[in-house]
UniProtKB/Swiss-Prot annotation:
This is Serpentine receptor class beta-1. It comes from Caenorhabditis elegans. It is a multi-pass membrane protein. Its main location: membrane. One of its GO terms (molecular function) is transmembrane signaling receptor activity. It comes from the Eukaryota. The chain crosses the membrane at residues 22-42, 66-86, 102-122, 141-161, 188-208, 240-260, 279-299. One of its GO terms (cellular component) is membrane. Keywords: Membrane, Transmembrane, Transmembrane helix.
Length: 341
């Protein structure tokens, strides 16, 4: 395709109603997701009472979502604004260097979001196996898993793009170059299978933990053990909610992407329609905003449930020798506080 035809294609695709509407959708949702994710990180994720390992991983996951939303807002802001100031059709062609930076940044952050939930499953399995002593484990596993997963993602992306020169004419930051499309398609298949497998693994962890918790509490009745098992249960439920919401949106994106690439141009009737279908990118930006509300709702429900459990189950005896000791401790605590005041 010569440069004139590419300029015509860029013009036809850019001003296609569906494509244009999708660009506005992505830009608006990504722009809203940036402050929402930032506040969610500061107000909800950083103060979590979870173990340091899973807390570090959750912070890393939502931080990558935040950075991804920032890059989406910038790149799709470009797509929204540039068509308003062009003087020729060829002005819609993205400069190779700018495309390379935008494309690699978007691909890196979306694949990080896809690969990090595997670390949740690994950490939860280890936490379950070490339930008796996990509260005393140092925060090493979480950072180690994150660094390993980031390294794996970088290696895989290098494999995908190592032969890409980025010298073609590009009209969208999210359209994978033709020379890399087949390799990236295979990577999408791997990620889709892995996402489904990870979701199944999370469900199994919850089922095993439920049975393990019931059996274990009959043998160990100390408050510290009960607290640790409850903490593992709560964190596992929260990571499952995040993983399920993730697979709902990201899995849909992967499935649709694979479908479009598989059926090809013939299914859509023309190359323009095929390019528009590949360029519609709304499920992932929608997820970046939706996960904030899902996370807030899940944490609020878990906190309310935990408070109700504490109020209904935690009691201090007031009769017998144990009651007398509790009374003496309460009086001593009161007079100590008065003397300090």
């Amino acid at each position: 395709m010569n440069i004139e035809n590419k300029c015509d294609l860029a013009f036809e695709v850019t001003y296609h109603p569906l494509y244009r509407a999708a660009q506005f959708w992505t830009f608006i949702f990504s722009t809203l997701a940036v402050p929402a994710l930032f506040i969610f990180l500061l107000k909800q994720i950083f103060p979590l009472p979870f173990h340091g390992n899973i807390k570090f991983m959750l912070i890393s996951y939502f931080l990558s979502a935040f950075l991804f939303a920032v890059v989406l807002a910038l790149t799709f802001g470009y797509h929204i604004l540039v068509p308003l100031f062009i003087t020729s059709k060829c002005d819609l062609i993205i400069q190779p260097y700018l495309f390379k930076v935008g494309q690699l940044s978007l691909t890196l952050f979306i694949t990080l979001q896809m690969i990090m939930p595997f670390g949740f499953s690994i950490e939860r399995i280890i936490a379950l196996r070490m339930a008796k002593s996990y509260e005393n484990v140092r925060t090493v596993l979480g950072p180690l898993l994150i660094f390993v997963l980031i390294g794996i993602d970088l290696i895989l992306l290098f494999t995908v793009f190592r032969d890409e020169s980025f010298n073609d004419s590009f009209i969208s930051f999210i359209l994978i170059p033709a020379t890399t499309a087949q390799t990236f398609n295979s990577y999408c298949w791997i990620l889709l299978y892995a996402e489904l497998g990870n979701l199944l693994c999370n469900c199994i962890i919850l089922l095993v933990h439920s049975k393990f918790k019931t059996k274990f509490l009959h043998q160990q009745r100390s408050l510290s053990v009960r607290y640790e098992l409850e903490e593992i249960s709560q964190t596992s439920k929260f990571t499952l909610i995040v993983s399920f919401t993730h697979i709902l949106f990201i899995g849909w994106y992967l499935g649709v992407t694979i479908f479009i690439r598989t059926v090809g141009e013939t299914f859509f009737g023309s190359y323009i329609n095929y390019t528009v279908a590949r360029g519609v990118y709304i499920s992932v930006p929608t997820y970046n905003l939706t996960i904030v509300f899902v996370g807030i709702k899940a944490l609020s429900f878990m906190n309310l449930k935990r408070q109700n459990n504490v109020q209904s189950k935690v009691q201090i005896k007031s009769t017998g020798s144990e009651g007398a000791r509790n009374y003496e401790n309460a009086i001593a605590s009161y007079w100590n506080s008065v003397s300090k005041a």
